[in-house]
Amino acid sequence: MNKIIAIANQKGGVGKTTTAVNLAASLAATKRKVLLIDLDPQGNATTAAGIKEENPNTLYEIFFENISINDSIYSSSSGYEILPGGQDLLALEVGIRNQNQQQFLAKTIQNLKTEFDYT
């Protein structure tokens, strides 16, 4: 059964990324299948995961370009999978609101329910 953990706070610099990356790595070290979704336009969790690709697929491509989520998940250097973040997520927020698709993320995660122990 997939467990979803959300780490959120409006204030910057409080350790959200550090907590998320370390939690994902710790769970992966115990042989659990983990997907970290980086929703930060700065993409710091993506960088911390060791993703070197210049413009990796993000939720933006899944929403606007109908890219498969499986083509948007990358393996981290610490043993967990990551759906990268990046600057295009700023436009995604507007698109979701304008198209009245507030359930987009929930539906996207639902499709992965059986593939990961933790998201």
Roles of regions detected by a PLM:
Residues 1-119:
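P-loop NTP-binding core
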